[in-house]
Amino acid sequence: MILKRCCEKLENLSLKIAFIESASSGYLCSQFSIYKNTGADILLGALVSYDPNIKQHILHIPRSLILQHSAESKEVTHAMAQQGLHLFTDADIVVACTGLLKPGGSATTEKPEGTFFISIAYLKKIKDIHYLLNGTALERLDQLTELVAQEVLNIISV
């Protein structure tokens, strides 16, 4: 399982990870916490910013950025990762996630249900990723977890 390998690699490198989640509502953080002898050693925690007011008032994401691009966008997710580094000062890696897990939100034909934006901050760089996932909400979250774990593994293995 990729998630387990990712957690073991984080632990071996003594790296700490934190999450700023919207669409995934803390699911990514919970999945990274479940492995014995890794969760407590690698995981700092998470902020779930499902409501745009949390993004604005806690993460200090400008309202204008949200209005211009929507709360579920590459630009807002990138800003969330940047702000996550300020919230989680001991984090080596911050993973931010927005998207459209279920119908509604800012869904369009160009950005349909199942769209996710991920930004991963590590070593003063931020990698932005876009996924379009199929399946039920839970299937999408499980796919997203594995994809994020693989991206983190790729980033820390360079």
Where are these regions (language model features)?
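Short alpha-helical segments enriched in small residues
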Residues: M1-V158
